[in-house]
Amino acid sequence: MSDTPFGDADHPRPAPIHPDAVLPPPMSSQSADNDPTEALNEAWTNILTKVSKPNRAWLSNTTPVTMHSSTAMVAVPNEFARDRLESKMRYELEELLSDHFHKAIHLAITIDPDLELALGAPDHEDEEEEVPPAQFVPKVTVGVTEPSARPTTTIDDDEGNRLNPKYTFDSFVIGASNRFAHAAAVAVAEAPGKSYNPLLIYGGSGLGKTHLLHAIGRYVMSYYDNVKVKYVSTEELTNDFINAIGTNRTTEFRRSYRDVDVLLVDDIQFLQSKIQTQEEFFHTFNTLHNAQKQIVMTSDRPPKLLEALEPRLRSRFEWGLLTDIQPPDLETRIAILRRKVAAEKITVEPDVLEFIASRIQTNIRELEGALIRVTAFASLNQQPVDISLAEVVLKDLIPEGRETPVTPERIIAETADYFDISADDLLGTSRAQTLVTARQIAMYLCRELTDLSLPKIGAEFGGKDHTTVMHADRKIRALMGEQRQIFNQVSEITNRIKQY
């Protein structure tokens, strides 16, 4: 890749969104009483009466999506329409939106190819064609952009990328709880360094933040030539830095993190209290941001709540766009389960999926875990997957009454007690089969029953690497559908934990 920034004179990078940009006067009471989507619909209708007739024709092809803090999200049918709004109308629209809401509003533009072009849309055959920056050229030319419509190419998941092929925009289920985060991720993937920089997605564990992070990386690499994407967890970033210091290879470390076009950092909250790593990341952030290279991060909370993070880093994390992901609503949970059974090629009746979705309301990971338990139980007993079976399985998973939060300490203690071993042995390194099985089940239950990320679970198990936790999770999931003993062990330990 060239060192030339993504933005250029013809494609200026939008000004970053900053909390200090919000003006004192409050939003009008009329708009404030509506939900964000209704408020934006009202504003958009008002704006259509104030723009020129040619611009009104262009705006008739747009659809207001939602409001998030000081950002208004609108959808257009294709790249040409987006470029038109970006280059010719952005500042006028932002000014009109700001006037309407009585505060500074940033316009976010995403592409929805399902939108039909209005019959009266202006003819743009004579419009001057804009050429993308030389260093960021698409592999093919397409008229309509949508993540699923992009060309599919082979991505080398080398050490610098390690992007999960299952985590794509196509496989991400969109609902009210994540719609804005998804739209922001797509916007960043389509125009790295131009839309929002940095983009920080925050929310509880198991809600899809990592999925979007990988989807951005895979999308960029599939569509653009010679682009360098680096995905890393904060734990790995810290370990890389410590190893670089110990081996006098800090120059190589800096090159590996700064000579990239898109840097994806997972679980940035774990940077807290790591003073030297924060210092190094501060300079890496500045280098990439000044070169208009894209930075995307995830966190379990917004920057202002990362109290053990240096203020200058918290401030920089707020330069771009902050967007959260909430637990999915019932409709989204059902859609997630439908997608899961289709991917796994298993048959589950709709009423069973609705029943499972109604019982699991916390996060996607636990939702999919419940489905796995139900289908595994049915497979072991050669029974059809029906509601009565689901009730039996989920009764132990979610007992009636008020439930206290599950902690890794409780999971470790109950698992050790079940296998009649000490907690120290369970957390140790012995490869004795009983200890390995107990350790893997405990890791699986931590993954399913808590909000802890993979690196955090690894830390609870004596500093195990996150890949060890991932392997344990996958292995136990598979064995539950194959070995009755494993299924019973997991179910009995879960029941003990839930009845604590």
From Swiss-Prot:
Oligomerizes as a right-handed, spiral filament on DNA at oriC. HAMAP family: DnaA_bact. SMART domains: AAA, Bac_DnaA_C. Pfam families: Bac_DnaA, Bac_DnaA_C. Belongs to the DnaA family. Residues 1-37 are annotated as: Disordered. GO terms for molecular function: ATP binding; ATP hydrolysis activity; DNA replication origin binding; lipid binding. The keyword Nucleotide-binding applies. Plays an essential role in the initiation and regulation of chromosomal replication. ATP-DnaA binds to the origin of replication (oriC) to initiate formation of the DNA replication initiation complex once per cell cycle. Binds the DnaA box (a 9 base pair repeat at the origin) and separates the double-stranded (ds)DNA. Forms a right-handed helical filament on oriC DNA; dsDNA binds to the exterior of the filament while single-stranded (ss)DNA is stabiized in the filament's interior. Domain I is involved in oligomerization and binding regulators, domain II is flexibile and of varying length in different bacteria, domain III forms the AAA+ region, while domain IV binds dsDNA. Residues 162-378 are annotated as: Domain III, AAA+ region. GO terms for biological process: DNA replication initiation; regulation of DNA replication. The lineage of its organism: Bacteria, Bacillati, Actinomycetota, Actinomycetes, Propionibacteriales. The gene is dnaA. Keywords: ATP-binding, Cytoplasm, DNA replication, DNA-binding, Lipid-binding, Nucleotide-binding. Residues 1-103 are annotated as: Domain I, interacts with DnaA modulators. ATP binds at G206, G208, K209, T210. Its main location: cytoplasm. Residues 379-500 are annotated as: Domain IV, binds dsDNA. The keyword ATP-binding applies. Residues 103-161 are annotated as: Domain II. This is Chromosomal replication initiator protein DnaA. It comes from the Bacteria. One of its GO terms (cellular component) is cytoplasm.
